[in-house]
Design a protein with these regions (language model features):
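Conserved AMP-binding/adenylate-forming
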Residues: 1-66, 73-76
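Generic structural signal for well-ordered beta-strand positions
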Residues: 42, 68, 159, 164-165
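AMP-binding/adenylate-forming catalytic core of the ANL superfamily
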Residues: 53-145
Length: 173
């Protein structure tokens, strides 16, 4: 949540809970939350800001003081009318891809946008069609979550804090 000036919620990190429970953020006292028309988190926290803070974080509210973070509104891929949240699909891929990677959308004449997977690797090649399914066969993906292409990029663009610059890395392919 890059728009916020301080923490507004906490997520339990220990493993003494179900996977579903481990994904839930609980808001701190004197913080209230809601969502806007896009499904993005809206924060009311007078100790943090006198103004209501609207983020680009897609969330699902699970009670008056808890939410499940889904991803970023600005990374959603609309592929053939299906809205795909890359961060949710990436969770499924993290166990089978050892290199750094991310999912993003590229323009597509038929679908509007197509989901593509970028992997940081020196292979400098592209996989598509059956090759993608074979590469990702161990992932538990729905038919819409399979990327149409896999691009291997030698080195991802990064911020000073080593976060992946998704947009500029995507422009490299």
């Amino acid at each position: 949540m890059t728009e916020t000036t301080s923490h507004i919620a906490l997520k339990r990190l220990n493993h003494g809970q179900s996977e579903k429970e481990s994904q839930i953020y609980r808001v701190l006292p004197e913080v209230s939350i809601s969502v806007d028309h896009r499904g993005c988190l809206v924060i009311d926290a007078n100790k943090v800001s006198s103004e209501r803070i609207t983020t680009n974080d897609l969330v699902k509210i699970v009670g008056k003081d808890a939410f499940h973070w889904l991803g970023r509104h600005d990374t959603v891929v609309n592929s053939g009318g299906i809205k795909l949240i890359p961060e949710q699909i990436e969770i499924k891929l993290v166990e089978i891809i050892s290199q750094r990677f991310f999912l993003a959308g590229l323009p597509d004449e038929t679908l509007g946008e197509k989901l593509v997977l970028l992997i940081e690797d020196s292979r400098k090649s592209v996989l598509n069609g059956k090759e993608v399914k074979n590469f990702l066969k161990k992932a538990n993906l729905s038919k819409f979550e399979y990327p149409k292409e896999i691009h291997f990029v030698k080195k991802f663009e990064e911020t000073q804090t080593k976060k992946i610059k998704r947009k500029s890395t995507l422009e490299m392919i």
